[in-house]
Amino acid sequence: TARRNIEGEITIEEVQHLVKTYYQRKTAREEDDDKKEEADRVSANIAQLLGEDSFVYSVVGITSIHRRIFEGVFKHAGEIRNFDISKKEWVLRGDSVLYGNAPDLRRALVYDLEQEREFSYIGIPIDKTIKHIAKCISGLWQIHPFAEGNTRTTAVFTIKYLRSLGFQVNNDLFSQKSWYFRNALVRANYHNY
């Protein structure tokens, strides 16, 4: 299905329909079918999002990205979580990053997005530009505004933001090195004082 879409034989909407009907009609179930279905649906949704030129740099924009990636996958797609979380990370030997607390998530997103919006890249060398963007994206990820799907949402948001700044970026590196991307975000936000 993916190959047929890449070669232009079918649209992304047709891919989404084929994925949905495949899992609805499948009679023999395997233990990991739920994970496979999530991955297939999310991949098709991400491809659709990245195929669009639109981008809104705001809290509404990032929550919309989450909703569109996970619609039909998570009941809470596009909703900012209302509970606190911690996650034992193997890369931190079971320790957790300190994520944003539930009552402050929206304000934290607004603050981080505004700080970035006010930053001027004029005259900044490319190495410092990249370092600044990495810090910005890392900070957004640390807020972890959603119950699930924060890393994938951050990746799509990052691609669309970089494109809005004039960078030519696609999803290949993020999809091929997703585990590295997540672990880099974890390490960038870990403090063990």
Predicted regions and their residues:
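FIC/Doc superfamily catalytic core
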Residues: T1-Y193
